Amino acid sequence: MNNHIEALSYYLGAFVDELTRLNVCDVVISPGSRSTPIALLMEQHEGMKTYLHVDERSAGFFALGIAKAKKRPVALLCTSGTAAANYYPAVCEAFHSRVPLIVLTADRPHELRDVGAPQAMNQFNLYGTFVKQFTEMALPEASEAMYHYARMTTQRTIASALLAPQGPVHLNFPVREPLIPDFSLESLWDKGRGEYTGVVQQGNVTMPSEYVDSLVGRLSHMEKGLIICGDGSHPEITEVVMKVAEKTGYPILADPLSNLRSGNHDKTMVIDCYDTFLRNELLKETWKPNVLIRFGGMPVSKALTQFIKKQTKAVHIVVDESGQWRDPALVATEVVQASDSEFCRALLEKMPVMKKNDWFGMWKHINEKTRETLREMETYETAFEGKVITDIVRVLPEGATLFASNSMPIRDTDSFFFTSDKNIQVMANRGVNGIDGIISTALGASIICDPLVLVIGDLSFYHDLNGLLAAKLHELNITIVVVNNDGGGIFSFLPQYEKKEHFESLFGTPIGLDYEHVVKMYGGSFSRVNGWENFREEVQTGTKTNGLHVVEICTNREENLKLHRELWAKTMDVITTSLQGESK
């Protein structure tokens, strides 16, 4: 037998087998030549589920979506050259949103590097600081030591991806020709396999009792506190953070991505309309918390971020399992390295029930006044983008997922996704907040989250049209609501809007595309709705039937801006009147 083929087969077979032993059982493969042996072995292994995606940029985000939904590592495989470079945006998003991706790039052997060989470029540390670990794998070799090396390297790599903060890792595989493994070899998957699988077991960081005692002592004298839950708050936090809020009397400002706004849990302490009422100047000047405790990433709301920045005399506690200093407001006074649930449990063990005061009641009252005013838009006949969110939530079934694209959809979700007893998961790409790869991420998530509705603007939809291929290839079920305002709607809300002379060409960027034919090219159904009743019917139909369904609702940027501003202005008047009445 050819010694090279034997080495290639056993060495890479050990690697693929070890991935599955470590519960990395999903791989997104971008077709190519140099990655042939790994791709074939993955397809052959009974423990591996493979997904083909021919566009590497979309493939990267597709894998990201699977990993986000499954909450476990997913592998991503491509050939050498620019194929690997096209994974870069998804790797950046995975790094900043703390999603474990196992990026596998095939490469030319060392003798073909830097000599002008075709499809060869420097892939060493290709993703720079956006991966937690880079490993240049050794060339295949037929020896027990190298089979063991393949498995041990896999174990270390997966451990790195899973340890807090979770994130992407990169393995680069130089491979010589010929590239076809020999599947007739005996015990193809067993080489280097020991009795045990070595992997770092995850556990909670225990909080020092001295710190807990000190914190409890301080909090007991701080009646005006806030609990802020952002994207990435651990699902286990729901019950315990509610108990902490009840004991302290601190309102919970829950970002939609915290998934605390919906479900059958007690939401008495949850505040959902802060993004609107924190725009009120009188409220911002008179409501001064003395402690803020934050879990997860910084919330979507700019109004909340600005409010936090102004609380310069308050104690700001950021809880982060990795201990990383995630504080874009630059006000953190303490960063506590602990899991969200561990921090809450430690407080609950020693925290007395604090004396009731008016603090929580103030927040609850203004929140209810704000929600009541905002809900007036539910009577609008005009195509208002905020109503897109409320009407989708209205028809979504129990257990559904709402994926909000970046730009306006996530902001409208923040403003108009009100608390609900229906269990609806909200997802988004808020690592680096780009508009690229949104369709692909949502499609990846739809493998696990069914039904899933994606809300996306027309520019973001255009940006990732190639991603629709995955729906056809893998027979995925998804409903995509395209809010088509013919351009970048968010810029109408920003200072750039005042530069009328160049606004449309540089920021409004109307592209005037009709998406019906491209959706049908990918085997999907397309409907352009006429009125809100028709909109709700189409969304509901999409969630109940298989396949790709695209529902387009056309809005006018100018009208949408006007309606947002009118609604905010009316809400500000209601809040100011309420605050002035309380002060008399």
Curated annotation (Swiss-Prot):
Transmembrane segments: none
Keyword Metal-binding in record: yes
Catalytically driven reaction(s): isochorismate + 2-oxoglutarate + H(+) = 5-enolpyruvoyl-6-hydroxy-2-succinyl-cyclohex-3-ene-1-carboxylate + CO2
Metabolic or biological pathway: Quinol/quinone metabolism; 1,4-dihydroxy-2-naphthoate biosynthesis; 1,4-dihydroxy-2-naphthoate from chorismate: step 2/7; Quinol/quinone metabolism; menaquinone biosynthesis
InterPro entries documented for this protein: DHS-like_NAD/FAD-binding_dom, MenaQ_synth_MenD, MenD_middle, THDP-binding, Thiamin_PyroP_enz_TPP-bd_dom, TPP_enzyme_TPP-bd
Keyword presence, Membrane: no
Example GO biological process: menaquinone biosynthetic process
Keywords: Magnesium, Manganese, Menaquinone biosynthesis, Metal-binding, Thiamine pyrophosphate, Transferase
EC number of the protein: 2.2.1.9
Stated family: Belongs to the TPP enzyme family. MenD subfamily.
HAMAP family in the record: MenD
Function: Catalyzes the thiamine diphosphate-dependent decarboxylation of 2-oxoglutarate and the subsequent addition of the resulting succinic semialdehyde-thiamine pyrophosphate anion to isochorismate to yield 2-succinyl-5-enolpyruvyl-6-hydroxy-3-cyclohexene-1-carboxylate (SEPHCHC).
Protein name from the UniProt record: 2-succinyl-5-enolpyruvyl-6-hydroxy-3-cyclohexene-1-carboxylate synthase
Species this protein is from: Bacillus mycoides (strain KBAB4) (Bacillus weihenstephanensis)
Gene (UniProt): menD
